[in-house]
Every structure is written in C-alpha cells, then in structure tokens.
Amino acid sequence: MASSSSSRLLFLLSCSVLALLAGAEVHHHEFIVQETPVKRLCKTHNVITVNGQLPGPTLEVREGDTVVINVVNHAQYNVTIHWHGIRQFRTGWADGPEFVTQCPIKPGGSYKYRFTIEGQEGTLWWHAHSSWLRATVYGALIIRPRENKTYPFEKPAREVPLILGEWWDADPIQVIREAQRTGAAPNISDAYTINGQPGDLYNCSKEETTAVPVKPGETALLRFINAALNQELFVSIAQHKMTVVGVDASYTKPFTTSVLMIAPGQTTDVLVTMDQAPTRYYLAARAYDSAQGVAFDNTTTTAVIEYDCGCATDFGPSIPPAFPVLPAFNDTNTATAFAAGIRSPHEVKIPGPVDENLFFTVGVGLFNCEPGQQCGGPNNTRFTASMNNISFVFPQTTSLLHAHYYGIPGVFTTDFPAYPPVQFDYTAQNVPRYLWQPVPATKLYKLKFGSVVQIVLQDTSIVSPENHPIHIHGYDFYILAEGFGNFDPKKDAKKFNYVDPPQRNTVAVPTNGWAVIRFVADNPGVWLMHCHLDVHITWGLAMAFLVEDGYGKLETLEAPPVDLPMC
C-alpha cells in the first residue's frame, strides 16, 4: 500500500491548519439552470444555461478555499453539475455525475454542492453531467495559489479563460435522443465556439466574435478549456508562440509550441508574449479527428487577439487579421508530439509497487438490431461502446454511491473484468465480427483504500480506431507512457517515464494505440471513468471504481447531505 492512515491523517490535518493560517475563504454561489433565448448562426434557440449566460459564470478561488454552490433547476430537463477535475476528498456526493454519485436534480428542485479545493492550482471547469446538457451548461473554474504564494512562472499582465465549445443549430437533447431511438450516430455540430461565439468565419457571427485585448510587450496567461462535446481540437495563434505551463490544474515544465491539441475535458494554460507588430491576429481552433470514415464538423472557430494600439477595433476593416497555420484534421503526428512535450515541472515520486495491474480496452461496437426493427447503424445495427467488452448501463432508480453507502442490493455488481475477457489483435484492420457486440451491464471494480493502481488503456479498431479522451472522476494520475499498436508489457514497460511524467485527470488515448496511467486509490467512494466524447459515454464507454473506506474518519466517505436529491 502506498499510503497509511497515519500519513493521510497528518496530511489532512496539516492542510486544515494551513487553510486557517492562510485565511481560506468560503465562496457562495447560486446557479439558476434555465432556458435562455440565444442567437447563433442567424437563428434564435431556447437553450439551457446557468444564470442566463453562455458560457456560464467563471468561479475564481484560491487553493484551500471551500465552495458552496446552490443549483436550482428551472429547466425542463433533469440536471446535475460536475466540478471537472476537483479531487473531492471524501465528498463524493458533490462530484455530480448523474446516477453515479447522485440522482438528478429534477425540474423545480435544488441541491447544494459543497467541497474544498485541496492541493490543486490552475484551470479546471464545471459542466452539466446529464444527457447532453453540457453542450451549453459549462464554465471555467480558476484556482489561484494561496495568499502570499506565487505562480511558478512570471506573473502575467492579464489572465483570460478561453472555453472551446460546440454549437448545434438544434436542441442537443433532442439530437441525442433521436440517435438513441434509431441507433444511428447523432448529427454532428454546426459550429465550434470560443467563449460561446463561433467567430467571423460563420454566418451572422462576425460582430460577436470573441476579442482578447492585449498591450504590446505584455505577457498574458491564456487558460484554454475544451468543453466541446465530441471533438478534440487543434488551437493556434497567428504569428505567436505559446509556452505551456499547466494542464488539468497541474503545473508543467514550460515548453514552447505553435499549436495545441486539447481533448474534451482537458485544460491547457499557456503564456503568450505580445511581441509582434501591433495589429490584430486570429486565434483559431479546428478539429483533430482520428476516426476513419466518421463524419465530423470540419469548420473553424476564431477569436481575435487585438493589440491596444489605436488600430481598427471593429470587424470590418479592409485588412483582415493574420490567420494561423493549423494542422490537417488527421495530423496524428502533431497531436502526438504535443502530448509528448508535457512533463511535470520537477522529478516526482511515482507511487509503487503496483497492487492492481489492470488492462482495459476502449472502443466503439455495434449491437444487432432487434428482430422486426430498423436500426440506423451500419448494416441495420445500433452503435454502442464499451470497456473490456462491457457496455456500461447507468442505473435509473438510485445512484451507485447511494446503493454502495446503504448496501442496497441489485443495483450493481463488483465483477468488472481486470483484463479483456477475450484477448485479440486489438488494432488489426479486420477484427472478427463476434467481438463487435459487447455485454450491457452495471459492473464496478473494487479497490482497497491506498492501493496503487496501474491501468493500460488500449484503443481497439472495432468499427474504427479513434483517439479516446478518458477521464477519471475523483483522481489525478500520472501518464507513464503512450504508444501505438498493441501494448507489449515486455517491450513497452521500458518506455515508462519514472522521472517527470505529466499529471492529469483526462488522458487522450492515442488512436490505434495505448496509454499507461498510475494513481493511488486514496479517495473513498464510487468514481466514474469514461470517455469524454459524450456520444461514447452515451453508448456505454464507461465503468466505475468502488474505492473502499480506509481507517478512521479521515479515510472514510462523508455521510450524504440532507438535501441530496432522491430518484
């Protein structure tokens, strides 16, 4: 075991003392989930927002602070809110995934989320975790250092959250419901957005293009968040270099690049020095799409970096802003090179030895259509997705955490397989058809408190190989290695980075490849692990860990709040 109850107790006690000494604050917010008329792409739609804003409110806190958010649901749909990347030590009831840690907040209902930020600094975000509501229900969560503590890099002249999103010229909930009804893939989005705006390459969008004002010579901290539902994105700024200094609320060794690749769920902090001629420059994002023969939104969203220099400030000048060079949509080499550049800032102590050595396949599959029905998938099938051939089924009458806490039988089992039930050539061009249909089930994997967990995440070429952003709730992890083809423990273990691997909460598993992650199971509760392409979690590309309590109060899940929603 990597941690003992005494060391954990001392850590939490020291955190509590430091919080008192540093004057940690309690932040109270109210989120009203409501329908709001929003005009994009020449049309007005009533979309679900928080407090009538798109994106929603930015939460700004310091490490050690406590956050209390009262979420009131005035919308027509059930809703939950997930605080993406927050560790939620012992406060799993506040994590937010629907039917995992809570039942949804029904229309007319409310729920008060309460949690403390422990040992995290940087950029995270919050979003709905019910159906496809996060298409418009999302916002930034900025964690700054404690008072009298500085960033591990030069203090920026300004900080700007830049949230990448997707926009449907339709109700996203109805888009996914229609896909679930027919078994077909859902309609692709009609635009990408930056801070809620598509940018001036789209119809009826020029005047509202997001602008980032800067001064010549200054350095800005740009906090990128990929909130897109289903698309990894390349990002670049014309004629400007970006220095990456953080990802997923973890600092990194600074490295300079002209292009970012950010998967849904991930965040990337960059420093940009405004050292070019004082005029206007496009900041642009477009798809990185690794799946072969799969439709995707091949448009480009833009914002404008505007030097405060007396140059034109409207969006109709005779000379347009300079445009960046973006990679081709299928440029896996660029995506791979960017991921390889991310490292922890210092040598880290990798947890070990490994207690749980797991191997999970991830990928899309197909269900046979029921007799007498017509289905919209290939050859009259229904799309599905799975981990280790288990297509995850969310309960509907209670949450997994509630069932675990109260010992309610029949909701889940704890026999999720540690390895694929059938071993095969995972990345072969022609995978046998009998492997295409997974088993639908609600299976969890049980972990002892303090156990060291290593997972090989292996993409498969069933239907199509694809880059999968895999997110674990309640945990950060170290990415020890990534590669292509089938993972070979004898050969590929030699590639493990035991010195300065990056720490993240979401890993983009390479298309036709694998990633190896490691973490300590030191947070009791039920924690979802899933693909952050929402179409894939809808199809079942998910599982959950049940982490047992440790010893004593500080290693035990807290009791549920009195206002926890019931199903």
From Swiss-Prot:
Co-factor binding details: Binds 4 Cu cations per monomer.
Plastocyanin-like domain mapped to chain residues: 32-148, 158-310, 415-551
Assigned EC number: 1.10.3.2
Cofactor: Cu cation
Chain residues that bind Cu cation 1: 82, 471
Residues that hold Cu cation 4 according to the record: 468, 531, 536
Keyword Secreted: yes
Enzyme class: oxidoreductase
Binding site for Cu cation 2: 84, 127, 532
Keywords of the record: Apoplast, Copper, Glycoprotein, Lignin degradation, Metal-binding, Oxidoreductase, Repeat, Secreted, Signal
GO terms (BP aspect): lignin catabolic process
GO molecular function, one term: hydroquinone:oxygen oxidoreductase activity
Signal peptide: 1-24
InterPro entries: Cu-oxidase-like_N (IPR011707), Cu-oxidase_2nd (IPR001117), Cu-oxidase_C (IPR011706), Cu-oxidase_fam (IPR045087), Cu_oxidase_CS (IPR033138), Cu_oxidase_Cu_BS (IPR002355), Cupredoxin (IPR008972), CuRO_1_LCC (IPR034288)
Keyword Transferase found: no
Subcellular location: Secreted, Extracellular space, Apoplast
Record field: catalytic activity: 4 hydroquinone + O2 = 4 benzosemiquinone + 2 H2O
NCBIfam families: laccase
Functional description taken from the UniProt entry: Lignin degradation and detoxification of lignin-derived products.
Name of the protein this chain belongs to: Laccase-3
Originating species: Oryza sativa subsp. japonica
Lineage: Eukaryota, Viridiplantae, Streptophyta, Embryophyta, Tracheophyta
Gene: LAC3
